[in-house]
UniProtKB/Swiss-Prot annotation:
Residues annotated as transmembrane: none
Origin superkingdom: Eukaryota
Designated name of the protein: Centromere protein N
Source organism phylogeny: Eukaryota, Metazoa, Chordata, Craniata, Vertebrata
Predominant location category: nucleus
InterPro entries given in the database record: CENP-NAC/CAD_complex (IPR052011), Chl4/mis15/CENP-N (IPR007902)
Family named by the database record: Belongs to the CENP-N/CHL4 family.
Length: 348
């Protein structure tokens, strides 16, 4: 076994939480149960990592075996990476061909290796998802296994979830995906998160959809609250019910997908109607700013704003539309009115 492969395997083992080490090694499947029983899990973790490398050397592990371990690690801890959603499309209406995994892998490798031979490509299926691992190299350097790109493709959908993709490699990977999946074009969606499953919930519409209602106010029956102590006056009962009703109508009642960030880029012209007149920004350049919202669970935080009394109900569509528009990055510009001094926000 090459020394650099041994070092790569060792680094993966060192990244594993101590309690998860044996679980990951069993899922890897390269070492037998009897071989795993010889391992002694103890601190420092370097001792365990060295023992794993020794077993791998005895079995002459290859880069494909090391890549398989990297697959298992990144699948189990996918939330350690930032994932971006890409969407593919076809120029003309046509029936989707039956997915042939072998043909997909062949065409994918062929497309990339036609441009660069010094690239290692591996595939692994996890349920309905096909995971692709690409380690990029140059003419003078071997593929960098420590900065591999991962792409997760669901064959029955036009969506691909990608992480670790540099700008220089993006055109080549996108071209390979389009060719192998028999689509015409691909584009990046304005949707990112560390929670891969939540991104899937959003683009596949798997999360709890809010109900639609033609009533702007809740039913009277919903306003009746059991009064435990008749001496207590529930002054805000009706308003609280209205807020909760609008919140349920906007976000639903089930769990929401997990996103950590939403950003809004604003471009607008400041204008004055006083004697100074004209634009307040020099050179007719628009004023630009970026507003970012962050939270460990942003959508749940937004849903709780109105019930907590922090914001008025209903919540602005700029915030509530995130899961339905499948994006958490927006650019807001102004609509040009008939009069120079008039402007208003535009839809996004």
């Amino acid at each position: 076994m090459d020394e650099w492969i041994a070092e790569f395997i060792k680094r993966i083992i060192l990244k594993l939480p101590f309690s998860q080490t044996m679980t990951i090694l069993k899922a890897w499947g390269f070492l037998t149960d009897s071989e795993l029983q010889t391992l002694t899990l103890r601190y420092p973790k370097d001792i365990t990592a060295t023992e794993v490398v020794r077993l791998c050397e005895a079995k002459n592990a290859t880069i494909d075996h090391a890549a398989a371990l990297d697959f298992v690690f990144n699948h189990a801890f996918s939330n350690k990476k930032l994932w971006t959603v890409y969407q593919m499309s076809k120029t003309s209406e046509s029936e989707n061909d039956l997915f042939d995994a072998s043909e997909f892998k062949l065409q994918f490798k062929k497309s990339i290796h036609a441009v660069s031979k010094n690239v290692t490509i591996n595939f692994k299926e996890f349920g309905e998802a096909l995971w692709i691992r690409i380690a990029w190299g140059t003419h003078n350097t071997r593929p960098n296994q420590y900065k591999a790109t991962f792409a997760v493709y669901h064959s029955q959908t036009p969506h691909v979830f990608i992480t670790g993709l540099g700008k220089a490699c993006r055109p080549l990977l996108c071209q390979a995906l389009v060719i192998a999946s028999k689509y015409s074009q691909i584009q990046e969606m304005e949707l990112k998160s560390r929670c891969l499953e939540s991104l899937k919930d959003i683009v596949f519409k798997r999360f709890n959809q809010p109900f639609s209602s033609h009533h702007s106010r809740p039913h009277e029956k919903a306003l009746t609250q059991k009064i435990v102590d008749p001496r207590v006056t529930y002054e805000n009962m009706r308003e609280k019910e209205r807020v909760h009703h609008l919140t349920r109508e906007t976000f639903g009642e089930g769990p929401l997908p997990k996103l950590e960030l939403a950003s809004y880029k604003l471009e607008t012209m400041f204008r004055a109607e006083s004697i100074m007149g004209g634009n307040l920004t020099a050179g007719n350049e628009p004023f630009r700013c970026v507003v970012k919202f962050s939270s460990p669970h942003l959508l749940e935080a937004i849903r709780s704003l109105a019930p907590a009394g922090i914001a008025e109900a209903p919540i602005s569509t700029l915030l509530s539309c995130i899961p339905h528009k499948a994006r958490n990055s927006f650019k807001i510009t102004e609509k040009r009115g008939l009069h120079p001094a008039s402007s208003q926000p535009t839809n996004f």
